[in-house]
Amino acid sequence: MKLFDEYPYLTDGRILLRKIVPADAGALQALRTDKEVYRYLLTFLYEQKYPDVNEVIRRMDEECFQTKESLLLAVCLTEQPDELCGIAEIYAYEPWRRKASIGYRLRRAYWGRGIAMAVARLLREYLFRTVHLHTVTAHIMTDNRSSAAVLLKAGFPERYSNVLEDWGLEVPVLVDKYVLKEAEDLAEQTGIRIENEV
């Protein structure tokens, strides 16, 4: 399956990722207007593009999914599947390299509950097992230690530290890059290590 063939519905039994729908407008508005949520995030994230949250949802399919720019999914608890508690994102898809990046942001009421780690694991599983990518990356501001802990627990090793990137702010920001390769993911799942030939 290719990444943009269809919207996935992913669950681990506790968390689910699904398509964002018009009924999510209120929760999405609460998320996107919380400055603390966006403290360590890019200034040009899609949910911030239009003043009207309903327009964001209306245009999301056409401007993100159909153009294959990014895939944004609602993060929900399985016991509350209609309540958006955050956004999961797959972006920077490079099909010729079988590579993509992931991101996530949660409403503050859902912080500290292991949800971000579950999201990272669900995206990882989907991208390696279903989409058959070779590489999945995540970029976070160096100061964002909470997200660093999430990614490490989700199995993403830190590969590059203190890299300057343009995140739409007045000056470039220091970013840490977490990169997971398919062979490493397989080794973690099976306990079998694949060594490169010399």
Protein language model regions, located:
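Short, conserved alpha-helical segments within structured domains
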Residues: 45-49, 71, 143
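A short helix-loop-beta-strand connector motif used in the catalytic cores of GNAT acetyltransferases and
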Residues: 58-74
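Conserved GNAT-fold acetyl-CoA-binding loop/helix
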Residues: 38-59
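Acyl-donor (CoA/ACP) binding surface of acyl/acetyltransferases
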Residues: 1-39, 72-198
